[in-house]
Structures are given as structure tokens and as C-alpha cells.
Amino acid sequence: MNEKQMILIGLLVIAFIAFLVVVNLLDSKSLNGIKAKKVGNGQHGTARWATKAEVKRTFISLPFEPDKWRKGENLPQSSNGDVIQGTVVGCRGSGKKTVALVDTGDVHTLMIGAAGVGKTAYFLYPNIELACASGMSFISTDTKGDVARNYGTIAKKYYDYNVSVLDLRNPTRSDENNILHLVNKYMDIYLSDKNNLSAKAKAEKYAKITAKTIINIGDGDIHNYGQNAFFYDAAEGLLASVILLLAEFGDKNERHIVSVFKLIQDLLAKYQPDPKAKPKMYFSKLMDKLPSEHKAKWLAGAALNASDQSMLSVMSTALSRLNSFLDSELEQMLCFGTAIDAEKFCNEKSAIFIVLPEEDTSKYFMVSLLIQQLYREILVIADENGGKLKNRVMFYCDEFGTFPKIEGAESMFSAGRSRKISIVAIIQSFAQLEQNYGKQGME
């Protein structure tokens, strides 16, 4: 090895040593060293990772002890004895012990994770366990049926919960859920005491809520109706009218959504009161038999005062929305009683699991329908209680981006928070939200 080669090797060694020194000196200036620093004066945003002190200040550290909770021991309570209710957003491990980080604020949560990362096992299950231990009522969507199988039994056996499994995959094995239940309930109270106007008003209110929810099935959006807005609005009033009539005059076993379809279909037929008179629809004849001050007559006023052709269009619009319920299996779930209604859900420890059939998306509209209706009925209960529920309720919407658009979802997130309603939306990517709600709705 000659002298030049020795010098070259020496220079390379010196350069390598200098490189290591520079890397070590600049390590404090790497991304790890500027976690909590803002760029400039916030021109590129002020978001940053929270410091350990901020995490400790924002979230409550709670020993996660499901084995003890199920025995009624060490239930989630703060130092002053208040029950800890909220969302598990993370955890810390300390030996064999796990400490959960719980957000107890009036907030909603968005959980994003690709398929297979453990959204259900490592996020949803701990949250449901905390909900049971702290006494929060909750509704959870379930695409595989695992959540209902695993935690339905736990909630009922160990935490004394009312449990309802709405199985859209096997409706014949599902618990019952008559979406007209509250209308029927308050109409019966009113019929037993005609002076109870509060019960009558509640029956009318829930009838209108149910009608609005049905009209908004799928892609129903008042902003997209355009020139057809009259027909959808009139169909909504017609549905509310027929629901009220069934609740008031129908037999006990016939007051369900399929009877609403059958009645509207029968009222489409025409009769000729006089050989020289123009044929009239039985719908008009039925309305003529009602007192002029009957609310069902008022609700159907838009359709009743339209031309025959417009009335046919209104009734056809209502029937088109009700077509989705014409399923021999679904009827076993929709045409009888209700295991858990909104009032029981808010006032007692209750859990509702909605099992989605991954192989049959035709039933996915029921998920949006059930969530919309339950949410709107809970708002009524909250308003009657001074604008806030007595006990927090949780909506665990697993695969939120998969099932059809929930009409008014944006307002659900904004209005529900102040009423002690927390929504936990679990998605795989923002693209799912953008597809269903558009870019503006996603944001």
C-alpha cells in the first residue's frame, strides 16, 4: 500500500468520524426534538402532539380491571365518588396492570384504522366494557356478530343490562323492534284518558319523527329534491297521518309499518259515489269521516287538497319508501313488540346491538333508519329533561363509512354533544366518508 492510498484511507476515516459527530450534535434538532414546537407563527397550522403533562391533564387515568368490575368491585369512580363515564382513547402498561386513558368530556370520537389492525378487539371492546361498568346505555353496530355474541352476554350476566340484539342477518332470530312502538304506547295512554293531552302530543310527535325518518331512507336529502320537494313533504305528512290513524283505530296486532303500507295501497283504489260523479279515491272518503280538527286530517292536508294526479304521486312516493320493509324475514322483527324503546334506553341500563349482514347490503338501510329514529327520539327525551340526558348514552358506530348515509349526521355530531350523547365513529379511511357525505360533509 503506497503513501497516497494511506492518505486517502485516513481522510475517509476522518470524514466518517466527522459525520458521526454531526449526526449526534443534530439529533436534538430532529423531529423527535421538536414535537411540541409550532412552525413559524402558525402559518402552516398549529396542530402538534400533546405533551405528557397535557395528556395527564386532559384525560383521566383509570385502572382497567374488567375482572373486578364484573364482580362489582372497584367500579370506575373518581376521587370524589363520581362515576367516570367517557371514551377510552388509549392505555399505558405497567407490569401486568393496564391503565386506561379516558376522555370524560362532552365529545365525539373518530377512530380510523385499516382492516385487520384490531379496531374491534383493541378499541371497541374496552369501550363497551367501560360503558357497562359505568352504567352508560349504548348502541353498537356489528358487522360480524362477534360484538353481540361476546358482550351481549357479559352486559346481561355481569352488569344487569337490558340487552336487545337486532339481527339483520337472521331477522327470524332477532329481538323485536316495532318502529311505531312509542306512537302506539302514547296513543293508548291518551285513549284511556282523553284529558291527557301530553300523551296525545307525544304520539303525534313520534309519528312525525318516524315519518321523516322513513322518507329520508337511503339518499333522501331535502336539498336534492328540487322541484319534487312538494311530493316528499306531502308524503311525509301522509305517512304521519296514516301512522296516527293506525295507532288510534287499528287492532293491537296490526299497528306496525307493514300495515301502513297495506292501508296506503288500499286507499289508492277509487270508488264512484254517484254514476254521474267523478271517481274519488278511498283516501278522500276516509278523511271525510274524520272530524275537521283531527290531526291526521291536518297532517294529510297537502295531499288531500292536491289534484288527483298529484295525490297519486304523493301516495306513490310514500309507497316507494315503504317498499324497503316488504321482506318476510324483516316483518318478524318489525311487526310485533319492542324489546328496548328510546325511553327505556335512556332511563335504564340498556344495550342495543345491530348485526349487519355483510353479504346482503339491501338491509343496510335499516341501520341508518334505526340510528336516526333512536337519536331523534332521544333528543325529545333530552329536551323534556332540561336539554340534557340524566345519564350519558353512547353510539358506537363500527364501520360508519360502510352503511348508507345517515341523513342529518352532521347535525347529530353538533347537537348531540350538548345533550350527553357521544358518538364514536369507526372507519377505515376518510375516502369512505367522502363517498357518502361529500367533501364538505366529511370535513
Task: For each feature predicted by the language model, list its residue ranges.
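Basic- and hydrophobic-enriched, low-structure N-terminal and domain-boundary segments
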Residues: M1-V117, A121-E129, S134, T172, ...
